[in-house]
């Protein structure tokens, strides 16, 4: 059985002073639909202690979720870097989504670049096409302001998809992780293909 642990973003609720850890309801729908026989748990932003929390629940897959940019919420950064390092050292499969993919890129020494107005016109709350290494074209959703360039990518990370318009990196893999710049939990044209990428990664990892 897969036991997913998924990180959360830090948000402010209207009318309340304290910060909250939150996760879009889309993720609950995603797990129910795509992994109905498996279980999942959200991970609070508690810094390095998140590793002990992950262990205490016997989780065996890490999802680093999207939302916001690296550096905006230091406690979340600390939490996710600690979990990422733990998962890499212990060969726990990692699925990194949007900001999560950027976090992986940063961990491996890559530079996160802020997109300009032209970039945002393609990638900010849009649908656009990507091309895979097999030259297949798919339509995905896009919600990010930051970008990853191929010439700044660590050699351990293999590109598997690029944007057809500006050729920025949209997905990469290595032996223990997959990074997707789009949001598989949200609606898009080629969601079936996107979900199969994740399932095949997990299947190959555990075979």
Q: Each predicted region: which residue ranges?
A:
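N-terminal beta1-alpha1 cap of cysteine-dependent amidohydrolase-like domains
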Residues: 1-99, 106-107, 113, 118-126, ...
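Glycine-centered loop/turn positions within well-structured domains
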Residues: 102, 110, 146, 178
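Active-site-proximal beta-strand elements of phosphoester/diester hydrolases
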Residues: 139-140, 178-183
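Short, proline-enriched alpha-helix->beta-strand connector loops that line the catalytic pocket
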Residues: 143, 153-155, 175-176
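The feature captures the conserved acid-bearing segment of alpha/beta-hydrolase catalytic domains
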Residues: 143-150, 169
């Amino acid at each position: 059985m897969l036991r997913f642990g998924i990180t959360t973003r830090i948000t402010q609720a209207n009318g309340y002073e304290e910060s909250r850890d939150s996760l879009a309801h889309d993720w609950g729908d995603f797990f129910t639909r795509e992994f109905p026989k498996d279980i999942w748990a959200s991970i609070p932003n508690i810094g390095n202690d998140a590793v002990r929390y992950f262990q205490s629940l016997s989780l065996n897959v890490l999802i680093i979720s999207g939302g916001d940019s690296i550096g905006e919420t230091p406690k979340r950064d600390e939490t996710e870097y600690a979990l990422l390092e733990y998962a890499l050292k212990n060969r726990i499969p990692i699925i990194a989504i949007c900001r999560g993919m950027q976090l992986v890129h940063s961990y491996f020494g890559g530079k996160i670049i802020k997109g300009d107005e032209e970039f945002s016109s393609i990638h900010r709350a849009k649908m656009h096409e990507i091309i895979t290494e097999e030259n297949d074209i798919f339509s995905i959703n896009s919600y990010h302001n930051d970008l990853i360039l191929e010439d700044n990518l660590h050699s351990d990370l293999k590109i598997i998809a690029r944007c057809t318009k500006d050729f920025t990196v949209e997905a990469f893999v290595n032996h223990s992780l997959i990074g997707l710049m789009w949001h598989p939990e949200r609606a898009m044209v080629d969601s079936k293909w996107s979900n199969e990428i994740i399932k095949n990664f997990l299947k190959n990892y555990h075979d």
